[in-house]
């Protein structure tokens, strides 16, 4: 292990295998706090490479609790958090709407990073159990088209890094790992990142990790597809990556100010999204979810973004998406 420390302190990059070896030791609790802090800061200052991020993700996936992976096509829709916008839970709402559109979503998430209420805070407010077993979650995915995998339940090794992360009070590699370590190992993913500089590196990381098709997005300061500004996209499709920009108009949607997506505490967000998913919500909220669902549906081969957004809006207005929420809560 010492030779890897020396390599990092010389500002040299690790190979994917070296990174996997190092992070396997981290999740086993084999590094003391000062060593872990030194590793994370040296990587942050130099800038983590896609190979290093992929190696770290593979170490955490190897250490994760088993999830019975289905043989059908399914996706994750998840953001890094940490964008500081305190918006409503767009990706969580999008998962339920996408399921209502007929695709399968195994959403990996955690408690809040950037907003006052992360995806699991919101789901708990809806009465959805966070400690559902892997088998129960798989059945929900089969039957309802949506399940939620609570990160701390599957990634117990994360706890070894938590005290150091809290003391450092700065973003580290762990801030981008969350979306990459879904224990269900989805072949498709829509991943939002907190910085435009991360869009291409995370897409390159997804390629290394073997994703079939994925899109990494950052829109006007948000780790989502934006409806107030252009969205930067890096799309991975069978090994090749294409970078492009999307505007709300590409989805056939109007623009809305970022302030229109302001969220609140978990109970407030629950009420906002309950109204939205029952077809009684704000038009800006519906548009934001429709844009994200539209890009997710594209990963399934539905290439027409305007058509996809319209399909999502129709599903939102029908109130069918909320039926998935109540059905998932009823499985508690």
UniProtKB/Swiss-Prot annotation:
Its EC number is 2.4.2.18. Anthranilate 1 binds at residues 79, 110. It catalyses: N-(5-phospho-beta-D-ribosyl)anthranilate + diphosphate = 5-phospho-alpha-D-ribose 1-diphosphate + anthranilate. One of its GO terms (cellular component) is cytosol. This is Anthranilate phosphoribosyltransferase. Mg(2+) 1 binds at residues 91, 224. It is an enzyme of class 2 (transferase). InterPro entries: Anthranilate_Pribosyl_Tfrase (IPR005940), Glycosyl_Trfase_fam3 (IPR000312), Glycosyl_Trfase_fam3_N_dom (IPR017459), Glycosyl_Trfase_fam3_N_dom_sf (IPR036320), Nuc_phospho_transferase (IPR035902). Homodimer. Its cofactor is Mg(2+). Binds 2 magnesium ions per monomer. Catalyzes the transfer of the phosphoribosyl group of 5-phosphorylribose-1-pyrophosphate (PRPP) to anthranilate to yield N-(5'-phosphoribosyl)-anthranilate (PRA). Pathway: Amino-acid biosynthesis; L-tryptophan biosynthesis; L-tryptophan from chorismate: step 2/5. One of its GO terms (biological process) is L-tryptophan biosynthetic process. The gene is trpD. 5-phospho-alpha-D-ribose 1-diphosphate binds at residues 79, 82-83, 87, 89-92, 107-115, 119. Belongs to the anthranilate phosphoribosyltransferase family. It comes from Yersinia pseudotuberculosis serotype O:3 (strain YPIII). Mg(2+) 2 binds at residues 223-224. Anthranilate 2 binds at residue 165. GO terms for molecular function: anthranilate phosphoribosyltransferase activity; magnesium ion binding. Keywords: Amino-acid biosynthesis, Aromatic amino acid biosynthesis, Glycosyltransferase, Magnesium, Metal-binding, Transferase, Tryptophan biosynthesis.
């Amino acid at each position: 292990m010492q030779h890897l420390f020396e390599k990092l302190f010389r500002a040299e990059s690790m190979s994917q295998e070296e990174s996997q070896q190092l992070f396997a030791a981290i999740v086993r609790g084999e590094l003391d706090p000062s060593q872990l802090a030194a590793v994370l800061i040296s990587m942050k200052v130099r800038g983590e490479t896609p190979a290093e991020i992929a190696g770290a993700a593979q170490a955490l996936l190897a250490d994760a609790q088993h999830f019975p992976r289905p043989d059908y096509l399914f996706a994750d829709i998840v953001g890094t958090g940490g964008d500081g916008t305190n918006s409503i839970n767009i990706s969580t709402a999008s998962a339920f709407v996408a399921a209502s559109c007929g695709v399968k979503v195994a959403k990996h998430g955690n408690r809040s990073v950037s907003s006052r209420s992360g995806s699991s805070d919101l789901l708990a407010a809806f009465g959805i159990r966070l400690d559902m077993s892997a088998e129960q979650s798989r059945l929900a995915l089969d039957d309802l088209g949506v399940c939620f995998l609570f990160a701390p339940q599957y990634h117990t090794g994360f706890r070894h890094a938590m005290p150091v992360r809290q003391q450092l009070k700065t973003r580290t590699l762990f801030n981008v790992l969350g979306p990459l370590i879904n224990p269900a190992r989805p072949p498709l993913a829509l991943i939002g990142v907190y910085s435009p500089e991360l869009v291409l590196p995370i897409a390159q990381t997804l390629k290394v990790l073997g994703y079939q098709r994925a899109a990494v997005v950052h829109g006007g300061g948000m780790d989502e597809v934006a409806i107030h500004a252009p969205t930067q996209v890096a799309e991975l499709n069978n090994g090749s990556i294409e970078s492009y920009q999307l505007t709300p108009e590409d989805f056939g949607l109007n623009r809305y100010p970022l302030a229109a997506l302001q969220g609140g505490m978990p109970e407030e967000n629950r009420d906002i999204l309950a109204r939205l998913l029952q077809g009684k919500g704000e038009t800006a909220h519906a548009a934001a979810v429709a844009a994200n669902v539209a890009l997710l549906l594209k990963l399934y081969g539905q290439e027409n973004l305007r058509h996809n957004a319209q399909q999502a809006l129709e599903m939102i207005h029908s109130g069918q998406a909320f039926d998935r929420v109540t059905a998932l809560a009823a499985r508690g």
